[in-house]
């Protein structure tokens, strides 16, 4: 998980839903339905850029849900309610980093779950965390977002992801899996920055 950029917002109880734009309003309405509350006023202070690979949808949804739950004196359970918000289906990494942060590997879903058989919103469980490591405090991550056209979204993004999973080469998948298990995770656990950086760069080229 990254400390910056991030989503920062607050919520107050209300009779209806009031949010600064359609994205936050959608998640606020879903959250109010899940929590069975009449509404909330949502005030957004910081937000993530969308469609640049930072998981902005999941962080926005869970942040909005959590703020509204607390505003109504309810205990938020983001992992339980992420599917009802349409999040945590293909990957549980976004939910796990929202919960605790860290360097996360999740257990994933069966390969046909979001390809041939696309479930309805809420009809899945968030994949559990397989491995979580705290990266050394002395490490610094530089995040560079190109000034380019944002990535795909909505159903176009969904079709692209389903196609990528369906058409994936088994040999390449095995190579990536071996890289993660044999190099990336051990170097993270040991705090070996050089080995971690080399493995991460290789992962980026293969993926």
Residue spans for each PLM region:
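Catalytic nucleophile loop
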Residues: 55-57, 95-96
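ATP-dependent small-molecule kinase catalytic core of the GHMP/sugar-kinase superfamily
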Residues: 77-207
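ATP-binding N-lobe of GHMP and related small-molecule kinases
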Residues: 1-56, 66-78, 83, 89, ...
């Amino acid at each position: 998980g990254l400390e910056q950029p991030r989503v920062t917002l607050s919520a107050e109880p209300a009779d209806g839903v009031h949010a600064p734009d359609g994205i936050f309003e959608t998640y606020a309405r879903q959250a109010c339905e899940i929590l069975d509350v009449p509404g909330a006023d949502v005030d957004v202070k910081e937000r993530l850029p969308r469609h640049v690979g930072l998981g902005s949808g999941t962080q926005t949804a869970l942040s909005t849900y959590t703020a509204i739950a607390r505003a109504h004196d309810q205990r938020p359970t983001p992992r339980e309610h992420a599917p009802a918000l349409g999040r945590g289906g293909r990957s549980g990494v976004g939910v796990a980093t929202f919960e605790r942060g860290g360097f996360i590997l999740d257990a994933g879903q069966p390969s046909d779950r979001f390809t041939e058989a696309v479930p309805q919103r809420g009809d899945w469980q968030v994949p559990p965390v397989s491995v979580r490591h705290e990266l050394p405090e002395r490490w610094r991550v530089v995040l560079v977002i190109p000034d380019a056209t944002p990535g795909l979204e909505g159903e176009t993004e969904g079709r692209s992801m389903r196609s990528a999973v369906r058409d994936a080469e088994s040999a390449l998948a095995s190579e990536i899996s071996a890289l993660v298990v044999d190099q990336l995770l051990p170097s993270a656990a040991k705090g070996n920055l050089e080995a971690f950086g080399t493995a991460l760069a290789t992962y980026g080229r293969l993926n």
